[in-house]
Amino acid sequence: MLLLIDNYDSFTYNLVHYLGELGAELDVRRNDSLTVEEAMALRPEGIVLSPGPCDPDKAGICLPLIDAAAKAAVPLMGVCLGHQAIGQPFGGTVVRAPVPMHGKVDRMFHQGRGVLKDLPSPFRATRYHSLIVERATLPACLEVTGETEDGLIMALSHRELPIHGVQFHPESIESEHGHKILENFLNTTRRLETAA
């Protein structure tokens, strides 16, 4: 079972739909409807942090849940707000983007790592955000796995743990390869099941 944390965003159920199409069993909970302890007691095979309208500090249990997932090596993927939230517990800073993006389709450049494995570079992805993880503050444990042409971080992964984030919206109809990106994340949860 995947635990999907809903950060009160209209895109949440697009994620639910895409993940369901890929065969994932989901338990969807609002970010303020359970504690970190309750979330981890569900023993999720993976955790997805949805987009949302706020900054990571106001996203309910997201920040401490990332810490708990990291300590337990539970695969975790963040989308938009969820991606930004991944940067903070490891020491990164979330700042205002140079230009707010609301429904802009942009080209994503990458090296085929993390959840962007086996995708062409560049590909088209939809951006809805006014905040970004600041590259200058990115801690050594996180690596940039995708970026815009002007170098803004659009995807990151933990170097040792199964933790991944994408700033763009793979669940948007305008984004290319959304199902494949989510499938790549699901494969990290399945590999851990097989190893257990």
From Swiss-Prot:
User: Which controlled-vocabulary keywords does the entry list?
Assistant: Amino-acid biosynthesis, Aromatic amino acid biosynthesis, Glutamine amidotransferase, Lyase, Tryptophan biosynthesis
* Family matches, as SUPFAM superfamilies: Class I glutamine amidotransferase-like
What EC designation does it have?
4.1.3.27
Query: What is this protein identified as?
Result: Anthranilate synthase component 2
Domain Glutamine amidotransferase type-1 residue range list: 1-195
Pfam families (alphabetical): GATase
Residues bound to L-glutamine are: 52-54, 84, 130-131
Gene label? trpG
Q: Which reaction does it catalyse?
A: chorismate + L-glutamine = anthranilate + pyruvate + L-glutamate + H(+)
> Subunit info?
Heterotetramer consisting of two non-identical subunits: a beta subunit (TrpG) and a large alpha subunit (TrpE).
